[in-house]
């Protein structure tokens, strides 16, 4: 399954708030579809999702929020299984430490897709090397910086709001537009409401 590039509100209506995917919020809590307003969530008490459907929904939330395709997510699950610790938590750590997510968390872009564009277009350096791979996994003590001829673009966004709260795992110099990674982003700082164990269960019989 390729990366999604269509309208975002129907996805948010189906999966709930996805902070990395879009700033949009479904204030009416209506399901997707032309007549979704007739089928508000409060009127669907009789509708019960299957266990498979619940796990699928959690998996989709991860995919859309972090902007990854099915093959990428499978690879992350496999890598999480190989590492020490809770597989679900390690999976979230891998996704949170992607360069596109770090750029988003620093407030350099409003969403992860927007952060990915900055990286793809060569605006970002890691340890003084230009990195144009959004899936690059950042490490502790990495230094993230913005190319000089690209800094005004980022400063304009920061002046218009930027990020409301910077993770304690990141240290940002707003004047230089340079940041250091102090620690791995832990589970309790993940913004997405997700049950990662259900994602691991979803793949338990597929991998």
UniProtKB/Swiss-Prot annotation:
GO biological process, one term: ribosomal small subunit biogenesis
Pfam family, one: Ribosomal_S4
Keyword set, alphabetical order: Plastid, Ribonucleoprotein, Ribosomal protein, RNA-binding, rRNA-binding
GO-annotated cellular components: plastid; small ribosomal subunit
PROSITE patterns hit by this protein: RIBOSOMAL_S4, S4
Biased composition (Basic and acidic residues): 40-52
Annotated region described as Disordered, given as residue ranges: 20-52
Cell location: Plastid
Summary of the function given for this chain in its UniProt record: One of the primary rRNA binding proteins, it binds directly to 16S rRNA where it nucleates assembly of the body of the 30S subunit. With S5 and S12 plays an important role in translational accuracy.
PANTHER family listed in its UniProt record: 30S 40S RIBOSOMAL PROTEIN (PTHR11831), SMALL RIBOSOMAL SUBUNIT PROTEIN US4M (PTHR11831:SF4)
Family named by the database record: Belongs to the universal ribosomal protein uS4 family.
Oligomeric form and interacting partners: Part of the 30S ribosomal subunit. Contacts protein S5. The interaction surface between S4 and S5 is involved in control of translational fidelity.
Name of the molecule in the record: Small ribosomal subunit protein uS4c
Organism: Prototheca wickerhamii
Lineage of origin: Eukaryota, Viridiplantae, Chlorophyta, core chlorophytes, Trebouxiophyceae
Name of the encoding gene: rps4
């Amino acid at each position: 399954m390729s990366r999604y590039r269509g309208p975002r509100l129907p996805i948010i209506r189906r999966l709930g708030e996805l902070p990395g995917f879009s700033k949009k919020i479904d204030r009416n809590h209506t399901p997707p579809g032309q007549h979704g307003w007739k089928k508000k969530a409060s009127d669907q008490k009789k509708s019960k999702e299957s266990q498979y459907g619940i796990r699928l929904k959690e998996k989709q939330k991860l995919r859309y929020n972090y902007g990854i395709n099915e093959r990428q997510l499978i690879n992350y699950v496999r890598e999480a299984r190989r590492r020490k610790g809770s597989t679900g938590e390690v999976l979230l750590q891998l996704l949170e430490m992607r360069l596109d997510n770090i750029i988003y968390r620093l407030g350099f872009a409003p969403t992860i897709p927007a952060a990915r564009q900055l990286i793809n277009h060569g605006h970002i350096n890691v340890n003084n090397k230009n990195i144009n791979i959004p899936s690059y996994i950042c490490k502790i003590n990495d230094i993230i910086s913005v190319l000089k001829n690209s800094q005004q673009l980022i400063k304009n966004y920061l002046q218009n709001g930027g990020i409301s709260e910077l993770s304690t795992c990141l240290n940002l110099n707003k004047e230089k537009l340079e940041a250091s990674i102090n620690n791995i982003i832990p589970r309790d700082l993940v913004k997405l409401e997700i049950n990662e164990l259900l994602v691991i269960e979803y793949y338990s019989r597929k991998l």
